[in-house]
Amino acid sequence: MTRYFSRVVAVAASAAFALGHAACATGSTPSASKAATDSTTPSASASVDVKQLTVAPGKLTIATGKPAYSPWVEDDKPESGKGFEAAVAYAVAEKLGFTKDEVVWKRTTFDEAVTPGPKAWDFNLQQFSITDERKKAVDFSSPYYTTTQAVLTYKGSKIAAAASLADLKGAKLGATIGTTSLSALNKVIAPTEAAKVFNNNDDAVLALKNKQIEGLVVDLPTALYLSAAIIDNGTIIGQLADNSGGDQFGLVLQKGSKLTAPVTAAVDALKADNTLATLEKTWLSESISVPVLQ
């Protein structure tokens, strides 16, 4: 549900805005592996030669957005391994037994990646939220990241000084259609005025920039990026509690892919050895300083 970014000034890890429908607490929950596709097994069989299961034998073809933005991919160059998702991709590749030189990158739109049918890549990552509806069309690995929702506004707005959910009840708030952000807005904040719903994130951001709405609900990494680089005098009021509808991001694979189990095992191993936590701290560290609204 989100792709739009560029690294910002002294931000140890600014955040991202993914064009299209990306939505979006950091880390994974104890039951995270349940979010993966039902066909996923706990680990890959030791007898499986993963390199013979890929779309191009001996190579691992990984897809991401076009373009891809910070902090997920730095400078739109996933091959650099810089940015949270670029780094995760190479870490997964290594766990699967591929060297960096054996990784091939492709670009796709967000929507085409989660559309049913054959894929020209082995897995795709661009902040895909794991949902039951999407699992009907594609496979997911276990989650590599979980994010909360946040409320973004601009300095001088009626809600700029809001310190609680109650302070937001009467505000003009908006979010993108079909996102966890919109669901959290309606269920957690439950504003007295109907939420403004936008067809895409670009429209939502433009509405906030033009002060047609007073606050925008997006995933926290996106809010951090927008406040620093896109919205003039942008400010984050706070994030919603962990249980308020955080998205779990998973790697997308073709439905029924023989790589789903090995890739999930790789993600689980990266979680177990704290690699994911280390990469999160490196690229998404700003998230921890945003207050939680109660």
Where are the predicted features?
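Bacterial lipoprotein signal-peptidase II cleavage site
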Residues: G20-A35
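Bilobed "Venus flytrap"/periplasmic-binding protein-like clamshell domains
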Residues: G81-K95, S129, T147-D203, G215, ...
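Extended ligand-binding regions for polar small-molecule ligands
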Residues: A86, Y90, E94-K95, T179, ...
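Periplasmic-binding protein-like
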Residues: K66, T146-T153, P221, A228-D268, ...
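Acidic, polar ligand-binding/catalytic clefts
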Residues: E102-L165
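Ligand-binding clefts/hinges and TM-proximal coupling segments of bilobed small-molecule sensing domains
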Residues: K51, T180-K196, T235-I236, V267-Q294
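Extracytoplasmic small-molecule ligand-binding "clamshell" domains
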Residues: A35, A44-N124
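A ligand-binding cleft/hinge motif common to bilobed small-molecule-binding domains
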Residues: E112, F128-A137, N186-K187, E214-G245
